[in-house]
Amino acid sequence: MTLPPFEPNGMPLSPGIRLLEASAGTGKTFALAHLVLRLVSEGQRPLAIEQLLVVTFTDAAAAELRDRIARRLQQALALLEAAAGPGDPAPPADLDQPLADWLAAQGPNPSAQLRGRLLLALEQLDRADITTIHGFCRRTLQRQALEAGLGPAVALENGAAERRGQIVHDYWQQQIGRAHV
């Protein structure tokens, strides 16, 4: 089954969970950064950056994603500011088609409110949940520790293989030790 190509400006922004799944090198990071731009700038009720949850697999991927989201928001803000200025500015040479289409959809006179939303998203980007699966689970447990019946210093197990090895070792010693007594 062949799927149609992903269109970053065509994905519905209705409330709910979205999964973007693709092979390595297919543009997932680019697509996610553009979707974040759309989520904080479009619709009747654009989201605040801290309302988003963006989850990936590795710390490096999460850091790269945060950086690419920041760059995408900066690109869009620069385009809006240029469009708000006098004259008809020439588009930058590195303007990609999804961003050009997004800008065209904003109309001939993008609002100052839209620029303000993007500026606020950039200023508050450090509050965004752009993390790994492990980081998301850790934060969720910490935020919900009391409701889950856990202490405030709850932590996820990082060395699971080592811990299993220690348990097997301890069990083995107890069983062998009993057999020789």
Residue ranges and their predicted role:
Residues 55, 154-161:
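Conserved phosphate/pyrophosphate-binding and hydrolysis machinery centered on Walker-type P-loop NTPases
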Residues 69-72, 167-174:
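Conserved AAA+ ATPase "sensor/coupling" helix adjacent to the nucleotide-binding pocket
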